[in-house]
Regions:
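Single conserved hydrophobic/aromatic residue that forms the stacking wall/gate
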Residues: 1-7, 11-12
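Acidic, carboxylate-rich catalytic segments that either coordinate divalent cations
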Residues: 137-201
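An amphipathic alpha-helical core segment
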Residues: 92-164
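Active-site beta-strand/loop microenvironment that shapes enzyme catalytic pockets
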Residues: 16-54
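Charged/polar positions within long, soluble alpha-helices
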Residues: 34-42, 64, 179, 183-186
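Short alpha-helix boundary/capping elements
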Residues: 29-36, 67, 116, 120
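Post-HExxH zinc-binding segment in Zn-dependent metallohydrolases
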Residues: 48-74
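Inter-helical turn/loop segments and adjacent helix faces that build the functional surface
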Residues: 15-16, 43-47, 69-107
Length: 201
């Protein structure tokens, strides 16, 4: 990840675009959180306890409750700006991906995330289960697992507490790591080794 970010920050220095800087800092936040938490999430899934999707969904539910949001009414994609301006901005650091494809990805992300919200008592999930039943129960379950459900689908309190502690660990790292990115947007330099992971750690 690190070498690619250095090139992206050079692009920010050249263009002096605040929107591009905001995107890169957001990308950095995503990287810090995932590279810290995914090793544990993947370990739990590999042990057959709880799937990656289900654990993250229940963690989302917990965080929504903690921050005063209703998991059955909250739309996580509300902050995504699916505009051509956003797509052109992202294209500056991902030049191999066409602006149109980035725009479509943003639109589809927003649409599908809204579909997964349980604002209808689970009706969309049930309809999806029925529509996907010809594909087999296992494949249908893989897709419908993404839908938020009215109630928690599994008792994973121990795993959620561990994930919460890992998120706190990521939050502690974030200020220094994001400062590294911000400095690169002003002058050339190098990122520390902690940027040399993948999103899976």
């Amino acid at each position: 990840i690190g070498s690619g970010l250095v090139g992206s920050e050079m692009c920010i220095r050249d263009r002096k675009n605040p929107a591009l800087m905001a995107y890169m800092l957001g990308f950095g936040c995503h990287y810090i959180l995932d590279s810290t938490c995914h090793p544990y999430v993947n370990q739990v899934a590999a042990e057959g306890k709880i799937s990656h999707t289900l654990l993250e969904k229940e963690f989302d539910r917990m965080l929504m409750y903690e921050t005063g949001k209703n998991p059955l009414r909250f739309y996580p994609s509300h902050g995504i700006r699916a505009s051509f301006y956003s797509a052109r901005t992202i294209h500056q650091v991902l030049p191999l991906i066409r602006t149109w494809n980035i725009y479509l990805s943003l639109k589809m992300m927003k649409i599908f995330t809204c579909i997964l919200v349980c604002d209808d008592g689970g009706r969309k999930k049930r309809l999806s289960e029925h529509a996907l039943s010809p594909a087999g129960r296992k494949r249908a379950a893989f897709i419908t697992e993404f839908f938020m459900s009215p109630e928690p689908e599994v008792d994973c309190r121990k795993e959620l507490l561990k994930l919460d502690s890992l998120m706190e660990e990521a939050l502690e790292k974030a200020p220094d790591m994001l400062e590294e990115l911000a400095v690169l947007a002003v002058r050339p330099g190098h990122l520390s080794e902690r940027w040399n992971l993948t999103f899976n750690g």
